Amino acid sequence: MGLEKSLILLPLLVLVFGWVQSSLGKETSAQKFERHDMDSTGSSSSATYCNQMMKRRNMTQGYCKPVNTFVHEPQTAVHAVCSQKNVTCKNGNSNCYKSHSALHITDCRLKGNSKYPNCDYQTNQLQKHIIIACEGNPFVPVHFDASV
């Protein structure tokens, strides 16, 4: 009888372990925003900044991400945008917020002749207002929507 119970519990334990292991490795939307769009340490005047950062942040694996923006402000300043002016997101959702002031950003755009695996980006340092989507409790940035 003990062996039968063990054989019944074993598949259940394997399923539970697999679920726990896969959920531990998942990146939240807020963590993805941090990885894709935050560089609080400051911008670089190097023309290769985007090439380095896109690779370092795993945005050139399997394909070249065409556009990305890095925000060079303290995390607290970017999180504060979630309580600023509410605007409509590009996709029509109503959870986007526009910064009151222009922030330091770097715009990375894939050069026209660039192809994977040799992703080559144009680096543009700018000061613009940012529009970000915010969600959760606490309310935090989860998506970079635009710069204006």
Swiss-Prot record:
<feature type="active site" description="Proton donor">
    <location>
        <position position="143"/>
    </location>
</feature>
<keyword id="KW-0255">Endonuclease</keyword>
<feature type="disulfide bond">
    <location>
        <begin position="89"/>
        <end position="96"/>
    </location>
</feature>
<feature type="active site" description="Proton acceptor">
    <location>
        <position position="36"/>
    </location>
</feature>
<dbReference type="InterPro" id="IPR001427">
    <property type="entry name" value="RNaseA"/>
</dbReference>
<comment type="subunit">
    <text>Monomer. Interacts with and forms tight 1:1 complexes with RNH1. Dimerization of two such complexes may occur. Interaction with RNH1 inhibits this protein.</text>
</comment>
<keyword id="KW-0456">Lyase</keyword>
<dbReference type="Pfam" id="PF00074">
    <property type="entry name" value="RnaseA"/>
</dbReference>
<keyword id="KW-0964">Secreted</keyword>
<dbReference type="InterPro" id="IPR023412">
    <property type="entry name" value="RNaseA_domain"/>
</dbReference>
<dbReference type="GO" id="GO:0005576">
    <property type="term" value="C:extracellular region"/>
</dbReference>
<feature type="disulfide bond">
    <location>
        <begin position="82"/>
        <end position="134"/>
    </location>
</feature>
<feature type="glycosylation site" description="N-linked (GlcNAc...) asparagine">
    <location>
        <position position="86"/>
    </location>
</feature>
<comment type="function">
    <text>Endonuclease that catalyzes the cleavage of RNA on the 3' side of pyrimidine nucleotides. Acts on single-stranded and double-stranded RNA.</text>
</comment>
<keyword id="KW-1015">Disulfide bond</keyword>
<feature type="disulfide bond">
    <location>
        <begin position="64"/>
        <end position="119"/>
    </location>
</feature>
<feature type="glycosylation site" description="N-linked (GlcNAc...) asparagine">
    <location>
        <position position="58"/>
    </location>
</feature>
<keyword id="KW-0378">Hydrolase</keyword>
<feature type="signal peptide">
    <location>
        <begin position="1"/>
        <end position="25"/>
    </location>
</feature>
<dbReference type="InterPro" id="IPR036816">
    <property type="entry name" value="RNaseA-like_dom_sf"/>
</dbReference>
<keyword id="KW-0325">Glycoprotein</keyword>
<feature type="binding site">
    <location>
        <begin position="65"/>
        <end position="69"/>
    </location>
    <ligand>
        <name>substrate</name>
    </ligand>
</feature>
<feature type="binding site">
    <location>
        <position position="90"/>
    </location>
    <ligand>
        <name>substrate</name>
    </ligand>
</feature>
<feature type="disulfide bond">
    <location>
        <begin position="50"/>
        <end position="108"/>
    </location>
</feature>
<protein>
    <recommendedName>
        <fullName>Ribonuclease pancreatic</fullName>
        <ecNumber>4.6.1.18</ecNumber>
    </recommendedName>
</protein>
<dbReference type="GO" id="GO:0003676">
    <property type="term" value="F:nucleic acid binding"/>
</dbReference>
<dbReference type="GO" id="GO:0050830">
    <property type="term" value="P:defense response to Gram-positive bacterium"/>
</dbReference>
<feature type="binding site">
    <location>
        <position position="32"/>
    </location>
    <ligand>
        <name>substrate</name>
    </ligand>
</feature>
<dbReference type="InterPro" id="IPR023411">
    <property type="entry name" value="RNaseA_AS"/>
</dbReference>
<keyword id="KW-0732">Signal</keyword>
<feature type="binding site">
    <location>
        <position position="109"/>
    </location>
    <ligand>
        <name>substrate</name>
    </ligand>
</feature>
<feature type="binding site">
    <location>
        <position position="35"/>
    </location>
    <ligand>
        <name>substrate</name>
    </ligand>
</feature>
<comment type="similarity">
    <text>Belongs to the pancreatic ribonuclease family.</text>
</comment>
<keyword id="KW-0540">Nuclease</keyword>
<dbReference type="GO" id="GO:0016829">
    <property type="term" value="F:lyase activity"/>
</dbReference>
<dbReference type="GO" id="GO:0004522">
    <property type="term" value="F:ribonuclease A activity"/>
</dbReference>
